[in-house]
Amino acid sequence: MKITMLGTGHATVTNCYNTCFTISENNKHFLVDAGGGNGILKQLKDSNIKPADIVAMFISHTHTDHIMGAVWIIRVIGRKYLVEDYKTPFNIYGNNEAISAIRKMCEAVLPQKWNDLFEDKIILNVVDTGVETNILNKKIEFFDINAKKVKQTGFMMWLNESEKFTFIGDETCSETTKKYVENSKWLFADAYMAGKEAEEYNPIQKHHHSTVKFVAELCKELNVKNVIMSHTVDTDLENRKKLFTEDAH
């Protein structure tokens, strides 16, 4: 399994792309969130990922920096069906609010022949806590993260019989979400900022976004082996990795 970060920033970053990534195996890809616009196409190109090789997309919630890029993915993949006689169905997963928003946006901004692909070639799958599916030959179980601002969904991907990758969206981990995080080999978590800046700004209280210190302590508490922190500020990208690493220890 390979993880490719396509973007690491929060909603209004200008020096990097919004947080989204692919999970890949055998040159097939699972796209998790899509960022806020057609910048997703450049990020995929720069990462040598062909849209035609994306087998499924998951949108965690309806905020612009996660869902707007989905329209561009649908536009590009839809063309594969319309022009190139592409055969493989494309599955999109999300909670009821996310799937409804995707459908409404596509109806508003894409030609009808793209919208005609829904339910036949492009499959919209509504998921909630306990729903399971198989992507890249791996079992995935979805769960509601009990977000404060808007309905948001996370998932566990089982890497083998005993190891899992857990994605918990872009809000602070709730008490009810901890059971999904516990004993993860990999955790993907929101970490808005680090160090003194985080202490002074207090993103947990203001925006329900985590800090590096909060996530590091969470990992220690729940026996998480590895963590990917994203959805961050872009004010000091050159030193961000160093600052975050130091604050996590």
Where are these regions (language model features)?
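Active-site neighborhood of phospho(di)ester-bond hydrolases with catalytic His/Asp-centered motifs
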Residues: L31-G35, I54-D65, G69, N95, ...
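Active-site metal-binding motif and surrounding structural segment of the metallo-beta-lactamase
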Residues: N38-N91
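Structured loop/turn residues at beta-strand edges in well-structured enzyme cores
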Residues: I49-A52, T88, D120, E182, ...
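Cap/insert and terminal regions of metallo-dependent hydrolase folds
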Residues: C173-H249
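Metallo-beta-lactamase
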Residues: Y86-K151, N160
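A short helix->loop->beta-strand "cap" motif at the edges of active sites that frequently abuts
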Residues: K28, Y86-F90, L222-V227
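Conserved beta-strand hairpin/beta-sheet module of binuclear metal-dependent hydrolase folds
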Residues: M1-S47, K151-D170, W186
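Active-site-proximal loop/helix segment associated with metal-binding centers of metalloenzymes
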Residues: V13-N15, V126-K196
